[in-house]
C-alpha cells in the first residue's frame, strides 16, 4: 500500500484561521493524504503563565510567547477542521494535554499523534489509547528503553498505533537522522513504522519510503522566513508536491520480490538487442541439426542462444532457409495444428515497418497500425 503522507501544519498558521484554511487548500493541491495540527490548553500544559515565566530558561519563554500568540482556540480549530472536511481529507491532531484530547474526541477526530516530547508521558498515552483511535507516536529525543516502555503500555491497552522515527533537532543534521533505526522500531513495536522529518529538503523522506516507511510527516508552510520554530524546516507547497510525486514514483519502482518477468519495454529491446539462433545453411525437413548448422546472431526474434544444446541433434519438422531464425516450435516433435481465425468485423495489428510484409501475406489483416518516429 502507498505511504500515508501528512502535511504537518502544526502552528504554522500563525494563529490565523484564514491562514490555516489557506494552508489546508495548498496541502490538498500538493497531494497530501492528511493535514495535522496541534492543540494545547495552555493552563493545563504549562506550570507558569504570564509574568511568572521570568524564572524560566529563555528558550521556554520564547516558546511560551510564540504559543500564546500563534495557538488557535478549540472553537477556531473546529472551524479549520470543518474546512478540511470539505476536501474529504483526513484530519489528524497532536494533543498536548488531557483537555485537548477530550476536545478532539468531542469533535470526532480521525486520529491523534503523540509528539516526541510526550513519549514518556504515560498518562497522556493511556488517555489517548483509551479512546480507540489510530495513534501515531513519534520517538524523537527518546532512549530505547523509553520507547520499549511506551510500546508495552500501548500494547497492553490494545491501542492501534504506528511508530515514527524522528530526530528532534531543527534542522536535523543528516548524520543524525538514522533511517536504519526504522527496522529496529518495527521490531520493537511489531507495527507499521514511518518517518517524521525535521531536516532540510525532502530527499530523506523519499529514502525513508524506499526503506519501508509507510507514513511520512513533513512540516508545511508558505514562507520559511516566518516567525516560529517550524517554518525553517518546513516544505513550501511546490516542494511538498514534488516530494509526493517522487515518493509515488519510488513506490512504483520498488515493485515486489516475485519471480522476475520481462517488462513490456524490455520485450522490444530483447528483440532489438538480444541474439538468436540462426541457420547457417538450408536445412530440409527431416534433417538432423548439427552444431555447425547454427550461429548466434542479432536480432533476438528467434530462439535464445541458451537453447543451443536442446536444438542440436533434433530432427527438423520444417524447412529452414539459410539465415532464418529457429523458434521454440523447433524444439517440439510436431508443429501443432494451425488454426484458421475468422472475425465478424474488420481487424488489424500493430506492426513494425521491417516485418509487416511477410505478416500481411500470411494473415491478411484489414488494417495495420504503424508507430512513427524520426
Regions found by a protein language model. Give the residues of each.
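Catalytic cores and adjacent flexible loops of soluble metabolic enzymes
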Residues: 1-374
Amino acid at each position: 500500500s502507498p505511504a500515508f503522507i501528512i502535511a504537518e501544519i502544526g502552528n504554522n498558521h500563525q494563529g490565523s484561521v484564514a491562514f490555516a484554511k489557506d494552508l489546508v487548500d495548498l496541502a490538498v493541491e500538493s497531494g497530501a493524504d492528511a493535514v495535522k495540527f496541534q492543540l494545547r490548553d495552555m493552563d493545563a500544559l504549562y506550570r507558569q503563565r504570564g509574568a511568572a515565566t521570568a524564572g524560566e530558561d529563555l528558550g521556554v519563554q520564547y516558546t511560551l510567547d510564540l504559543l500564546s500568540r500563534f495557538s488557535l482556540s478549540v472553537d477556531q480549530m473546529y472551524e479549520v477542521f470543518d474546512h478540511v472536511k470539505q476536501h474529504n481529507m483526513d484530519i489528524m491532531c497532536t494533543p498536548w494535554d488531557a483537555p485537548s484530547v477530550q476536545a478532539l474526541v468531542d469533535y470526532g477526530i480521525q486520529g491523534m499523534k503523540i509528539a516526541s516530547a510526550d513519549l514518556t508521558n504515560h498518562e497522556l498515552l493511556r488517555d489517548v489509547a483509551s479512546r480507540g483511535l489510530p495513534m501515531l507516536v513519534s520517538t524523537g529525543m527518546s532512549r530505547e528503553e523509553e520507547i520499549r516502555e511506551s510500546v508495552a503500555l500501548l500494547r497492553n491497552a490494545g491501542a492501534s498505533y504506528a511508530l515514527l522515527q524522528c530526530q528532534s533537532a531543527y534542522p536535523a543534521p543528516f548524520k543524525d537522522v538514522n533511517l536504519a533505526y526504522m527496522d529496529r522500531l518495527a521490531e520493537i513495536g511489531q507495527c507499521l513504522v514511518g518517518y517524521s522529518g525535521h531536516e532540510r529538503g525532502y530527499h530523506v523522506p523519499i529514502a525513508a519510503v524506499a526503506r519501508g516507511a509507510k507514513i511520512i510527516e513533513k512540516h508545511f508552510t508558505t514562507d520559511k522566513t516566518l516567525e516560529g520554530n517550524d517554518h525553517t524546516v518546513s516544505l513550501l507547497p511546490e516542494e511538498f508536491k514534488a516530494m509526493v510525486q517522487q515518493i509515488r514514483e519510488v513506490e512504483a519502482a520498488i515493485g515486489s520480490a516475485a519471480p522476475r518477468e520481462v517488462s513490456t519495454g524490455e520485450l522490444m529491446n530483447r528483440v532489438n538487442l538480444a541474439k538468436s539462433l540462426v541457420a547457417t545453411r538450408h536445412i530440409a525437413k527431416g534433417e538432423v541439426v548439427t552444431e555447425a548448422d547454427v550461429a548466434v546472431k542479432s536480432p533476438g526474434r528467434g530462439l535464445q542462444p541458451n537453447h543451443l544444446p536442446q536444438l542440436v541433434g533434433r530432427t527438423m519438422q520444417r524447412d529452414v532457409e539459410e539465415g532464418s531464425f529457429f523458434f521454440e516450435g523447433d524444439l517440439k516433435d510436431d508443429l501443432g495444428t494451425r488454426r484458421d481465425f475468422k472475425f465478424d468485423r474488420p481487424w488489424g495489428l500493430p506492426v513494425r515497418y521491417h516485418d509487416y510484409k511477410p505478416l500481411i501475406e500470411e494473415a491478411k489483416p484489414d488494417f495495420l497500425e504503424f508507430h512513427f518516429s524520426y
